[in-house]
UniProtKB/Swiss-Prot annotation:
GO terms for biological process: pyrimidine nucleobase transmembrane transport; uracil catabolic process; uracil import across plasma membrane. Belongs to the nucleobase:cation symporter-2 (NCS2) (TC 2.A.40) family. The chain crosses the membrane at residues 58-78, 80-100, 111-131, 141-161, 170-190, 197-217, 241-261, 285-305, 319-339, 348-368, 386-406, 407-427. It comes from the Bacteria. The lineage of its organism: Bacteria, Pseudomonadati, Pseudomonadota, Gammaproteobacteria, Enterobacterales. It is a multi-pass membrane protein. The Rut pathway degrades exogenous pyrimidines as the sole nitrogen source at room temperature but not at 37 degrees Celsius, a restriction that is apparently a consequence of an inadequate ability to remove toxic malonic semialdehyde at the higher temperature (RutE/YdfG function). Disruption phenotype: Cells lacking this gene fail to grow on the nucleobase uracil as the sole nitrogen source but use the nucleoside uridine normally. It comes from Escherichia coli (strain K12). Signal peptide: none annotated. Induction: Up-regulated by the nitrogen regulatory protein C (NtrC also called GlnG) and repressed by RutR. This is Putative pyrimidine permease RutG. Pfam families: Xan_ur_permease.
Length: 442
């Protein structure tokens, strides 16, 4: 098949249970639509939760995730099976840049959007460079020890935000604990797709419990469904205009480094599952993701990234057809044009969102450790040990550096600190040949 241009998508006659469906193959229309629904559901939990945590409109973010996925599909020539959803990497820096308190709509959303656009631009430029010279320089700049440390630092940096969001009252704190337990029980005691959707299912169960305890038993603030009943079934989401603030852009733009590392890992995972070489499309994937992030930020949506949740669905179903993600994108766009759906999202109690964020932020931190384990990172080397130790404290302590009028927050200092310390302290192990033994004749 040609390196660039769209494949022909040969019809796969076997069922999804008995055979693998390759990226350049397709299922019958009905099965493609059903698989699209499954992928839309898989991305739903995080794509809704992340914009809420940043004070963005989740309805618009869902719409832009669908549009971004279609843009990614066209830029990669329909060769890379991936779904683009709201990225957790933006949460900490957006909150730091805007001073968002975690409740309702972010009043400083405009400067956050300018930063998201700047991040997408940096990401796109990196993709263009990769298209020219390949990815080896990225792997040298950000080896697994660096990416693992930065990802873990992001999770630790977000931890105080999650805890503070559920500390308003004793009832909120206990409901957050109940939410954590709901998600944990789903993760451990369910199987198949329900287990894959642990965040979404856990949120639904926790919301039902919250409704019973407040609306029925009167133990807390009741859930108000007035907005849901008055909202229209179809309509435009709320768009916002970006503002370009230098300090916010400097704070948010470095997230591009995290997105590159994340996308790189996801593409390698997809390549391993499909048996296809994804390296020729890596630069295009970065460009597609970067442009989708810029487009989303330009109208009020969150930054996007390829989703591990959907990679997990592919691993289970063995269906890698890229047309499935077109179906998922169309479904997401339809949901994004439903104000009633958006109003329903806004009824999720803050305590439940806070409990879910405790789990999500913890999983982000653990994902960093998983990178180390999967790549057999040697933390007994002093260079690696010092780099990781400093990076984690910079991120967890939200260490900031100010230069002139610009301030680099904890995630930014952790990211650049990890890259710089790795470059300074890493050393290649050189095999020293054993001394030559000279045998003298007696």
């Amino acid at each position: 098949m040609a390196m660039f241009g769209f494949p022909h998508w040969q019809l796969k006659s076997t069922s999804t249970e008995s055979g693998v469906v390759a990226p350049d193959e397709r299922l019958p229309f009905a099965q493609t639509a059903v698989m699209g629904v499954q992928h839309a559901v898989a991305m739903f939990g995080a794509t809704v939760l992340m914009p809420i945590l940043m004070g963005l409109d989740p309805n618009l973010s869902i719409l832009m995730s669908g549009i971004g996925t279609l843009l990614f599909f066209f830029i990669t020539g329909g060769r890379v099976p991936s779904y683009l959803g709201s990225s957790a990497a933006f949460v900490g820096v957006v909150i730091a840049a805007t001073g968002f308190n975690g409740q309702g709509i972010n009043p400083n959303i405009s400067i956050a959007l300018g930063g998201i656009i700047a991040c997408g631009l940096v990401y796109t430029v990196i993709g263009l460079v990769v298209m020219k010279i390949g990815t080896r320089w990225i792997e040298r700049l950000m080896p697994p020890v660096v990416t693992g440390a930065v990802v873990m630092a992001i999770g630790l940096n977000l931890a105080p935000i999650a805890v503070k969001s559920v500390s308003a009252s004793a009832f909120d704190s206990w409901m957050a604990v109940m939410t954590v337990l709901c998600i944990g029980l789903v993760a451990v005691f369910t199987r198949g797709m329900i287990q894959r959707l642990l965040i979404l299912v856990g949120l639904i169960v926790a919301c039902l419990l919250y409704g019973v305890m407040t609306n029925v038993l009167g133990l807390g603030k009741a859930v108000d469904f007035t907005l849901v009943s008055h909202a229209a079934w179809f309509g435009l989401p709320h768009f916002s205009t970006p503002a370009f603030n230098g300090q916010a852009m400097m704070l948010i733009a470095p997230v591009a480094v995290i997105l590159v590392a994340e996308n790189l890992g996801h593409l390698k995972a997809v390549a391993g599952m499909t048996g296809r070489n994804m390296d020729p499309y890596m630069g295009r994937a970065f460009v597609g993701d970067g442009l989708a992030t810029m487009l989303s930020g330009s109208v009020g949506g969150s930054g996007v990234t390829t989703y591990a949740e959907n990679i997990g669905v592919m691993a289970v179903t063995k269906v890698y057809s890229t047309l499935v993600f077109v179906a998922a994108a169309v479904i997401a766009m339809l949901l994004g044009f439903s104000p009633k759906f958006g109003a329903l999202i806004h009824t999720i109690p803050a305590a439940v969102i806070g409990g879910a964020s405790i789990v999500v932020f913890g999983l982000i931190a653990v994902a960093g450790a998983r990178i180390w384990v999967q790549n057999r990172v040697d933390l007994s080397q002093n260079g690696n040990l010092i780099m990781v130790a400093v990076t984690l404290v910079l991120g967890a302590g939200d260490f900031a550096l100010t230069l002139g009028g610009f301030t680099l927050g904890g995630i930014g200092t952790a990211t650049f600190g990890a890259i710089l310390l790795n470059a300074l302290l890493s050393r290649k192990l050189v095999d020293v040949p054993p001394p030559e033994v000279v045998h003298q004749e007696p």
